[in-house]
UniProtKB/Swiss-Prot annotation:
InterPro entries: Hanta_nucleocap. This is Nucleoprotein. Its main location: virion. Residues 1-79, 100-125, 377-425 are annotated as: Homomultimerization.
């Protein structure tokens, strides 16, 4: 009984501390709105962390209280001599022992799964902001994404920029862009922006602006994306003119050979793919595309558009909804995700370690991309991905950045100098450069 009393006292004490901390947080938020200097911002951040820590502790104490009550009930319950729980439906005891009781009260099954998002609501929300704050937030979540996520994990952050404001009764107030930084256990709402959803929607809406400012995710930089896109118009034009191995045109006797060759081109296969996509539209995504078309966004309407590959410059985790019905676009994103997996496999293969350690360094970008994109209502055409790989795979692998650009002869000379100097000053074994 004393344990329950102690836990209850801890809960009461932490609830009181949480009330005070939340009030201090409100005061800090008001102070930042009035005077957004570094001191006030640091105070706000510290108080947010305090509130978060108290909430976590309080939740932990409540869980401990529930466990203690459950344990007390179990202790007072008469034991069945057969070893079967009273509410178990088995007539004879299972060969397995009874394990933990999983409490599912906190789970809301009305919430969507992690693969589902309300793209129309998300798109309307993002388009409502000025372009500078959108692109700056994209930079923070792509080029500097790893650092931003690491520093803010488990919180809902707000991006602020002087270009983003709203007038309320003649008073100019900042209009913050909210992005949630979930942990592995977080449940996201359908309309909630996460870094992955933000990159997906912004890349699909503003590829031209991303191209002009050369905003790029590091994972795309290391697979040679800059090299790939520099002559995109010429590259895709040549690709479309080549013969497609998956087309066998039905031609009438006497058809000119030149016309038969025209019917075997990749361009014809892409036209057939476009016909398939035109029959598989989803209403919400159509609404988003129509809404975007009425504003400034620059979504590509064809894969040979100059800005088409820039849709994937910031490594969205799926094909953006604004170009999912453009033949070849979803497959181009899948091609990039395979290249990321290929590079990571090469990097894992060349490292020293056990087979298990090497496997941990491999990635599954392609499987994740495939699953997320197909959850939006389309099936990817694996043949198009194969065509891309046959056409550009070897060239792209040759342009991977593998973190080992030093000339072998230069490396050997540098290592010899290191070995010599280490032997002069110590009896330790020299390290490898």
């Amino acid at each position: 009984m004393s344990d329950l009393t102690d836990i209850q006292e801890d809960i009461t004490r932490h609830e009181q501390q949480l009330i005070v901390a939340r009030q201090k947080l409100k005061d800090a938020e008001r102070a930042v709105e009035v005077d957004p200097d570094d001191v006030n911002k640091n105070t706000l951040q510290a108080r947010q962390q305090t509130v978060s820590a108290l909430e976590d502790k309080l939740a932990d104490y409540k869980r401990r209280m529930a466990d203690a009550v459950s344990r007390k009930k179990m202790d007072t319950k008469p034991t069945d001599p057969t070893g079967i729980e009273p509410d178990d439906h088995l007539k004879e005891r299972s060969s397995l022992r009874y394990g933990n009781v999983l409490d599912v009260n906190a789970i809301d099954i009305e919430e969507p799964s992690g693969q589902t998002a309300d793209w129309y609501t998300i798109g309307v929300y993002v388009i409502g902001f000025t372009l500078p704050i959108i692109l700056k937030a994209l930079y923070m979540l792509s080029t500097r994404g790893r650092q931003t996520v690491k520093e803010n994990k488990g919180t809902r952050i707000r991006f602020k920029d002087d270009t983003s404001f709203e007038d309320i009764n003649g008073i100019r107030r900042p209009k913050h862009l909210y992005v949630s930084m979930p942990t592995a256990q977080s449940t996201m709402k359908a309309e909630e922006l996460t870094p992955g959803r933000f990159r997906t929607i912004v890349c699909g809406l503003f590829p031209t602006q991303i191209q002009v400012r050369n905003i790029m995710s590091p994972v795309m930089g290391v697979i040679g994306f800059s090299f790939f896109v520099k002559d995109w118009s010429e590259r895709i034009r040549e690709f479309m003119e080549k013969e497609c191995p998956f087309i066998k045109p039905e031609v009438k006797p006497g058809t000119p050979a030149q016309e038969i060759e025209m019917l075997k081109r990749n361009k014809i296969y892409f036209m057939q793919r476009q016909d398939v996509l035109d029959k598989n539209h989803v209403a919400d995504i159509d609404k988003l595309i129509d809404y975007a078309a009425s504003g400034d966004p620059t979504s590509p309407d064809n894969i040979d558009s100059p800005n088409a590959p820039w849709v994937f410059a910031c490594a969205p985790d799926r094909c953006p909804p604004t170009c999912i019905y453009v033949a070849g676009m979803a497959e181009l994103g899948a091609f990039f995700s395979i290249l990321q997996d290929m590079r990571n496999t090469i990097m894992a293969s060349k490292t020293v370690g056990t087979a298990e350690e090497k496997l941990k360094k491999k990635s599954s970008f392609y499987q994740s991309y495939l699953r997320r994109t197909q959850s939006m209502g389309i099936q990817l055409d694996q043949r198009i991905i194969l065509l891309f790989m046959l056409e550009w795979g070897k060239e792209m692998v040759d342009h991977f950045h593998l973190g080992d650009d030093m000339d072998p002869e230069l490396r050997g000379l540098a290592q010899a100098l290191i070995d010599q100097k280490v032997k002069e000053i110590s009896n330790q074994e020299p390290l490898k450069i």
